[in-house]
C-alpha cells in the first residue's frame, strides 16, 4: 500500500494550518482568511504548502500542481474550510488512470479536515483515549461494557493508536468511513480501537488486552473488514451486530404477522432479511372452507414491502427484504410480474427483492423442455399431507411426482407449464429488473451440515448466508467479517483467519438479537461468515488472470482450511456448538458436507484435511457455518480494495455522490493496470467457473452477480456484429447450477447503445 506518514503538520492549538500571522501574499496584497473558530488572520501560503506537501508525501503526484490549482481559487474572506474543500476538489479533478494517486491526496486532505474539526469541537485530537471513552459513555454514545476495562487498561490501549493509518484511505474510503460510521466528535482510530476492545471484552481478563491489540491492528491495517452492523452498532448501547437473517412464514395469520413484526425489528437494527413465503396458500385457494377466497402470497409480500419502507433502518435507508418463493408455487407467474409497471398497483411490490427457490428437478426439466406443475401448498397439505416447502432432493422429487400423479383426482388447483418457457420468463424479468435472485435449493441443502435438525428454505438478502430455519423457533442469523485480500499474502491467511473466526464467535456473545427466534438460532448453531474481498487485487498484484483457477483454488483452500481449523481450536477452548451432535461435522464430513476422500483427491495439502476431520470428530467445532462471501459493495471502498471476489466493473470510473463526482479505482491500478480485467467485457462463464472453484472451499454461499453486456462485438471479436442473445444467458445460468454454485444474486446488464468507456460513470452495477 502507500507509505504511512511519520507525522502530520498539526498545530497544538485550534488554529488552522491554512492561516497564521506570518507574512503571506497573494496577487500583491494580503488576503484575510476566516478560521474555523470565526477569527480572521492573514493568509499564510507557507502553511498551505506544508499541508499540500504532507498530503502528497510518498505518492506519485506533483504537489506544485495542486498548489497552483488552488491559487486561482483564493479570494478575500475565504474560510479555511473553503481552502480545504478547494484543495480536495483540485486533487479529485487531477485524478486520472495515469495519475490515480490524487485520490489518496484527497483522502488525506479529508482526514486532515476531520482532525481539525475535532480539535475545534472538543479541544484535542488523538492522545486522550481514556477521556474520549469516559465522555462518550457518560453521553450514552458508547456501550458501558467498554468500562469493564480498567482506566489503566484503556490508557494502555490508547497508546496503540497509530494516526498514520488514517492517511491510508483514498477519498471514497475516507468519506464513507467518516460519514457513515463515525459518531460525533470521534476519530477513525478511536472507533476502530473501541470496536476491538469490545470484541475482546468477552475474553479471559488476563488475555483480553492481548486479543484486543491483535483485533485492533488487523482492523486498523485493513486486513479484516468488519461488516456494517458490527462497525456501526458495536460501540452503541444495545446494538445488533448481525448482518443476515432468514425467517419463514407458516400459513396462518399469527405466523404471518409475527414474521412481519420480526422483519420490522431486523430492519430497525440495520439488518437485511430473507422471508420465505412458500407455505402460504395460493391465489384462489380456500379460506375457512370457502373456495377461491385466498389472495395468495402477493398481498403479504406487499405488506413486507411497505414494512421495509416504513422501518427505515434508524432513518439511514429503507429496509432490505428478499421474499423467497419455491418455483412450484401456483403464484410464481404473478410473483414474476410483481414489479412490472402495468397491472393492478395494489398487487405490486417495487421495493422488495424477489427470490425464486429452484430444485434440481426443475432445472432438469428446463434442460429437457419438460412440463412443470404449479400447485397450491394448502391443497397439497390438506389433501395429501405433504408440506412441500420442507422437502428437497429425493424426498421432494418423490412427493412431487406423487402430486402430479394425483392431478384432477385429488389436486384440483394447479397449472401445467413448460419448464423451459417458465425459465425464459424468469430470464426476461432478470434482464429487465436484475431479479429474481435464484437459489438452488438442493445444492444448498446437500451441503448443509445440520440436516439432522432441519432444512434451509432459501438464502438471505445477499445470497451468501443461510442455515436451518424453523418458523416460530429458529430464524437464521449470521455475523460477518471479510478478509481484505489486497493486503494479505498466502502466509498471512492462517493468522488472520484465526483472528477473524475468534472475533465473530465473540460477537455472538455481544450482540442483542432483535427477537427470540434469532436468539435461539444464535445459541444453537453459532453461525458466522468469514468472507473475502479484493480477489481482483490479489490476482493483479501477482500478475495473474481471473481464469487462473489453480491459484484461486490454492488461495481459497487456505482460507477454508484455516477458518475451519480455527473454529475447531475454539471448540477445544469453549466447546462445540450445541447442535453439533448428529451433524455432518461429527460424522467426519468437512466443508460442504464432503467426505475426506474429496479433499484427498482435490486439495493441495490433502494430509492436513484428514487430520482436521479427525480433530473435529474428537473435539467438535465451534460454529456450524464458518465462511460466506458477501458482496461488500460499499465496505470495499472503505477498505481500499475491489468488491468481493468479482472482477472490477471498470478499471477507472467516476461515481456521482452527494459531495460531487468521485474517482473510483482499484489499489494497484498504477502498476498492474492491464491485470485488472473489466467485468463489463468479460465472458461471464469465467466468473461462474471462478465462483464454482471458490464455492468448493466455502461452506455457506457466495454473492455471485453476473453482468451481461448486450452490445455487439463484446464477446465475439471474430463476429463484430454479433451480440449476446437469450441462449447465451440461458447457457450461463444453467452452467452455474451444473457447476455447483448455490445461488445467483443480481443479473446486471449493459444495455445496447449504453456502453460506457472506463472513464464514465458505472451504469450497470451501482448499488
Curated annotation (Swiss-Prot):
SUPFAM superfamilies, alphabetized: PFL-like glycyl radical enzymes, R1 subunit of ribonucleotide reductase, N-terminal domain
PANTHER family the record matches: RIBONUCLEOSIDE-DIPHOSPHATE REDUCTASE LARGE CHAIN (PTHR11573), RIBONUCLEOSIDE-DIPHOSPHATE REDUCTASE LARGE SUBUNIT (PTHR11573:SF6)
Descriptive protein name: Ribonucleoside-diphosphate reductase subunit alpha
Active-site residue list: 460, 462, 464
Domain ATP-cone: 31-120
GO MF annotation terms: ATP binding; ribonucleoside-diphosphate reductase activity, thioredoxin disulfide as acceptor
A cellular-component GO term for this protein: ribonucleoside-diphosphate reductase complex
Alphabetically ordered keywords of this record: Allosteric enzyme, ATP-binding, Deoxyribonucleotide synthesis, Disulfide bond, Nucleotide-binding, Oxidoreductase
Broad class of enzyme this protein falls into: oxidoreductase
Reaction equations catalysed: a 2'-deoxyribonucleoside 5'-diphosphate + [thioredoxin]-disulfide + H2O = a ribonucleoside 5'-diphosphate + [thioredoxin]-dithiol
Feature type site, description Important for hydrogen atom transfer: 244, 478
Example GO biological process: deoxyribonucleotide biosynthetic process
Function: Provides the precursors necessary for DNA synthesis. Catalyzes the biosynthesis of deoxyribonucleotides from the corresponding ribonucleotides.
Residue positions binding substrate: 228, 243-244, 272, 460-464, 631-635
Activity regulation information from UniProt: Under complex allosteric control mediated by deoxynucleoside triphosphates and ATP binding. The type of nucleotide bound at the specificity site determines substrate preference. It seems probable that ATP makes the enzyme reduce CDP and UDP, dGTP favors ADP reduction and dTTP favors GDP reduction.
Organism of this sequence: Synechocystis sp. (strain ATCC 27184 / PCC 6803 / Kazusa)
Amino acid at each position: 500500500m502507500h507509505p504511512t506518514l511519520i507525522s502530520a503538520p498539526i498545530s497544538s492549538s485550534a488554529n488552522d494550518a491554512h492561516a497564521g500571522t506570518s507574512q503571506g501574499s497573494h496577487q500583491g496584497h494580503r488576503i484575510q482568511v476566516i478560521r474555523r473558530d470565526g477569527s480572521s488572520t492573514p493568509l499564510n501560503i507557507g502553511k498551505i504548502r506544508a499541508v499540500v506537501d504532507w498530503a502528497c508525501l510518498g505518492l506519485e503526484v506533483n504537489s506544485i500542481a495542486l498548489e497552483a490549482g488552488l491559487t486561482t481559487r483564493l479570494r478575500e474572506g475565504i474560510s479555511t474550510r473553503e481552502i480545504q474543500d478547494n484543495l480536495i476538489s483540485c486533487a479529485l479533478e487531477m485524478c486520472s488512470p495515469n495519475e490515480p494517486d490524487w485520490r489518496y491526496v484527497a483522502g488525506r486532505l479529508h482526514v486532515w479536515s476531520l482532525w481539525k474539526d475535532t480539535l475545534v469541537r472538543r479541544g484535542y485530537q488523538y492522545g486522550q483515549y481514556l477521556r474520549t471513552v469516559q465522555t462518550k459513555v457518560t453521553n450514552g454514545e458508547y456501550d458501558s461494557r467498554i468500562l469493564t476495562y480498567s482506566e489503566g487498561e484503556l490508557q494502555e490501549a490508547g497508546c496503540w493508536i497509530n494516526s498514520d493509518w488514517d492517511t491510508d484511505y483514498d477519498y471514497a474510503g475516507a468519506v464513507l468511513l467518516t460519514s457513515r460510521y463515525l459518531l460525533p466528535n470521534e476519530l477513525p482510530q478511536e472507533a476502530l480501537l473501541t470496536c476491538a476492545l469490545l470484541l475482546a471484552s468477552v475474553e479471559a481478563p488476563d488475555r483480553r488486552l492481548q486479543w484486543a491489540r491483535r483485533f485492533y491492528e488487523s482492523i486498523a491495517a485493513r486486513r479484516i473488514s468488519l461488516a456494517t452492523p458490527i462497525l456501526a452498532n458495536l460501540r452503541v448501547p444495545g446494538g445488533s451486530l448481525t448482518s443476515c437473517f432468514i425467517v419463514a412464514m407458516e400459513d396462518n395469520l399469527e405466523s404471518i404477522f409475527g414474521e412481519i413484526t420480526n422483519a420490522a425489528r431486523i430492519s430497525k437494527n440495520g439488518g437485511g432479511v430473507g422471508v420465505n413465503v412458500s407455505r402460504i396458500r395460493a391465489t384462489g385457494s380456500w379460506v375457512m372452507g370457502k373456495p377461491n377466497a385466498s389472495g395468495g402470497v402477493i398481498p403479504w409480500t406487499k405488506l413486507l414491502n411497505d414494512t421495509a419502507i416504513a422501518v427505515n433502518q434508524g432513518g439511514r435507508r429503507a429496509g432490505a427484504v428478499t421474499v423467497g418463493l419455491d418455483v412450484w408455487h401456483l403464484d410464481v407467474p404473478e410473483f414474476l410480474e410483481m414489479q412490472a409497471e402495468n397491472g393492478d398497483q395494489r398487487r405490486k411490490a417495487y421495493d422488495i427483492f424477489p427470490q425464486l427457490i429452484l430444485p434440481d428437478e426443475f432445472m432438469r426439466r428446463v434442460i429437457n423442455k419438460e412440463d412443470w406443475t404449479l400447485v397450491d401448498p394448502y391443497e397439497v397439505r390438506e389433501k395429501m399431507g405433504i408440506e412441500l416447502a420442507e422437502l428437497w432432493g429425493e424426498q421432494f422429487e418423490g412427493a412431487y411426482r406423487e402430486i402430479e400423479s394425483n392431478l384432477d383426482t385429488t389436486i384440483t388447483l394447479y397449472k401445467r407449464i413448460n419448464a423451459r418457457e417458465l425459465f425464459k420468463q424468469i430470464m426476461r424479468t432478470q434482464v429487465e429488473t436484475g431479479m429474481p435472485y435464484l437459489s438452488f435449493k438442493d445444492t444448498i441443502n446437500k451441503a448443509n451440515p445440520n440436516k439432522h435438525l432441519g432444512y434451509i428454505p432459501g438464502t438471505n438478502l445477499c445470497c451468501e448466508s443461510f442455515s436451518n430455519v424453523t418458523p416460530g423457533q429458529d430464524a437464521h442469523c449470521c455475523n460477518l467479517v471479510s478478509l481484505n485480500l489486497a493486503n494479505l499474502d498466502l502466509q498471512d491467511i492462517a493468522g488472520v483467519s484465526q483472528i477473524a473466526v475468534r472475533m465473530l464467535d465473540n460477537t455472538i456473545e455481544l450482540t442483542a438479537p432483535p427477537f427470540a427466534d434469532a436468539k435461539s438460532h444464535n445459541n444453537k448453531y453459532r453461525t458466522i461468515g468469514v468472507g473475502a474481498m479484493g480477489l481482483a487485487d490479489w490476482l493483479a498484484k501477482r500478475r495473474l488472470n481471473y481464469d487462473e483457477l489453480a491459484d484461486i483454488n490454492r488461495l481459497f483452500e487456505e482460507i477454508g482450511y484455516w477458518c475451519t481449523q480455527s473454529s475447531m481450536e475454539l471448540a477445544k477452548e469453549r466447546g462445540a456448538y450445541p447442535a453439533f451432535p448428529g451433524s455432518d461435522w461429527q460424522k467426519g464430513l468437512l466443508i460442504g458436507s464432503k467426505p475426506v476422500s474429496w479433499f484427498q483427491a482435490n486439495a493441495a495439502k490433502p494430509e492436513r484435511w484428514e487430520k482436521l476431520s479427525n480433530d473435529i470428530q474428537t473435539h467438535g467445532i465451534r460454529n456450524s457455518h464458518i465462511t460466506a462471501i458477501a458482496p461488500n459493495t460499499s465496505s470495499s471502498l472503505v477498505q481500499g480494495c475491489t468488491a468481493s471476489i468479482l472482477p472490477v466493473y471498470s478499471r477507472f470510473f467516476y461515481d456521482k455522490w452527494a459531495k460531487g463526482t468521485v474517482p473510483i479505482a482499484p489499489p494497484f491500478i498504477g502498476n498492474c493496470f492491464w491485470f485488472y480485467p473489466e467485468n463489463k467485457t468479460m465472458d461471464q462463464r469465467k466468473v461462474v467457473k471462478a465462483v464454482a472453484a471458490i464455492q468448493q472451499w466455502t461452506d455457506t454461499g457466495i454473492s455471485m452477480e453476473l453482468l451481461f453486456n448486450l452490445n455487439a462485438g463484446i464477446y465475439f471479436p471474430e463476429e463484430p456484429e454479433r451480440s449476446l442473445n437469450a441462449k447465451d444467458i440461458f447457457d450461463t445460468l444453467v452452467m452455474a447450477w451444473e457447476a455447483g454454485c448455490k445461488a445467483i444474486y443480481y443479473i446486471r446488464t449493459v444495455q445496447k447503445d449504453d456502453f460506457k468507456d472506463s472513464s464514465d460513470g458505472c451504469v450497470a452495477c451501482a448499488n
